[in-house]
Amino acid sequence: RDVERSRGLGDVYKRQGWMGEHGEEMRRLCAEEGKTLFWSSNFSLGVAIFSAVNKYLAKIMNNFPNYDVSMVETHHIHKLDAPSGTAITLAEGILENLDRKNKWVMGTLTAPDGTVTGTTACASDEMPVSAIREGEVPGIHTIRYESEADSIIITHDAKNRKGFALGAVLAAEYTATHEGFLGMNDLFQF
């Protein structure tokens, strides 16, 4: 990164928890000192599209209070955080658009050995986000709206890491010609 800085290039970051620790400082540096940073919890083009669909569906579901929403994310056994940064970003997209939900809560966690801890029981204004750790799964995110009559389910299933790599390259190219605090919503304006 020192080489990038010495050449005046911006940074492209994907690191869980990093923005919680450094987000305000990075936004300030971009705004006040002309720095450039492209940050995302997930660089996959498919996840960017899925996120837009997720937000739109949440807006629609405001008109249908008999549907309750939940999420399950599945990742490889080496992933340490639960829920994933992508799941948190998707949950925040729902909370921004679905008036009856005010916060997400950790649901169940299925460990690599099959042990399940936690619960999906929560207050009516909360949305459970559950996590499964199994095999070498790159990432699956499923959002479910459930009623007594039926279910509406949307899923993004990463088959490999190619989509993440493509998105990171597109973000780097975008950063070369744009300034400030940037993200996937700047790169893809759905």
Language-model-derived ranges and their functions:
Residues 65-190:
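C-terminal substrate-binding/catalytic lobe of Rossmann-fold NAD(P)-dependent oxidoreductases
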Residues 17-20, 42-44, 74-76:
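Short, ordered loop/turn segments at secondary-structure junctions
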Residues 16-37, 48, 53-56:
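Rossmann-fold NAD(P)-binding glycine/threonine-rich loop
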Residues 2-13:
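Single conserved hydrophobic/aromatic residue that forms the stacking wall/gate
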